[in-house]
Amino acid sequence: MIRRLIFALFAWSAALPAAAQTAPTPAPNPRVALETSAGRIVVEVYLDKAPITAKNFLRYVDQKRLDGIVFYRTVKVADHFGFVQFGVQNAPTKMLPPIKHEPTSETGVKHLDGTLSVPRLAPGTARGEFTIMLGDQPSFDADPSKPGDNLGYAAFARVAEGMEVLLKIFDAPTSPTKTLQGSFKGEVPEAPVKIVTARRLAPSD
């Protein structure tokens, strides 16, 4: 009896470290629905891999700063290859402070088809403008072998649903003459698609 009790206590105590080392299941990454005038796009936001850039995007979503904005730029390099851009267009009432740059060499999030990224000037100047890749764009990734500013752009999310909507936006005609404050000639859509609302989805959605 005593021997069985000692064995049981030993087995119980031996199991404690294994139980203590069991890691909790990480929370799923947030998903955001962009309800546009062309249809719904759902993006998975990589809060686990690019937390600074992901949190910045989610602040714009949660504060409803993306409601009513448009896809104002389409860069068509080739058939279904390039990117579309949306954001607050530097509107003072909608902009939040700039964020620290997270290069792809640190996050591991590459500029692949359907990836969301943030435009910038110098590192640490990104704010409320966002791009979505059509096709893989490795030239946007950090490349330490290049001279000068080789940190690339910060990728932070991907399209989980609605690539057909994104393609519809990309394929829409652009104006040969329109510009935005003198820039992006030939890249401004004739009829920009509006983001009606941008909202987080519940995990079960």
Identify the residue ranges that each predicted region occupies.
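Sec-dependent signal peptide recognition
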Residues: I2-A8
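Intrinsically disordered, low-complexity sequence elements enriched in Ser/Thr/Gly/Pro
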Residues: M1-I2, N29
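Cyclophilin-like peptidyl-prolyl cis-trans isomerases
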Residues: A18-D205
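N-terminal signal peptide c-region/cleavage motif recognized by signal peptidases
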Residues: S13-P17
